[in-house]
């Protein structure tokens, strides 16, 4: 039994959406990991009594003022938080569309039997 063209099209859309959703979730996870690393770095810097810290740049460590590095890290944290929020919104929209397509496909497959 061959599936109607509209059902085949919905299956393709469903599979593409599934791949996109996985990619969004993966990217969000990557940004969340970076965010946690940045927050941990700031936390560790605050524990340090020194006014200077070492920052990795191009494979070497450079001595820098702690306040400057903290400011840079804080800006990076802010950027990462925005990206994570953006990915969460995209994931939510895609998840909703995914569920709708899944329900439509189940109905279409149920009618075809």
From Swiss-Prot:
Q: Which Gene3D superfamilies match?
A: 1.10.287.370
Recorded GO MF terms = unfolded protein binding
The family database entries (CDD domains) matched by this protein are listed as: Prefoldin_beta_GimC
Q: Does the keyword tRNA processing apply?
A: no
Q: Which Pfam families does this UniProt record tie to the protein?
A: Prefoldin_2 (PF01920)
Top-level taxonomic group: Archaea
InterPro entries, per database record: PFD_beta-like, PfdB, Prefoldin
Free-text function comment from the UniProt entry: Molecular chaperone capable of stabilizing a range of proteins. Seems to fulfill an ATP-independent, HSP70-like function in archaeal de novo protein folding.
Protein name (database record)? Prefoldin subunit beta
Q: Which organism is it from?
A: Methanococcus maripaludis (strain C6 / ATCC BAA-1332)
């Amino acid at each position: 039994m061959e599936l109607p063209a509209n059902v085949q099209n919905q299956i393709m859309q469903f599979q593409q959406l599934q791949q996109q959703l996985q990619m969004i979730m993966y990217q969000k996870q990557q940004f969340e990991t970076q965010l946690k690393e940045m927050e941990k770095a700031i936390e560790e810097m605050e524990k340090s009594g020194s006014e200077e810290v070492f920052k990795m740049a191009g494979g070497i460590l450079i001595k820098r003022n702690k306040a400057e590095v903290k400011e840079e890290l804080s800006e990076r944290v802010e950027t990462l938080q925005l990206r994570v929020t953006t990915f969460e919104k995209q994931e939510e929209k895609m998840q909703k569309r995914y569920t709708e397509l899944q329900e439509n496909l189940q109905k279409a497959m149920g009618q075809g039997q």
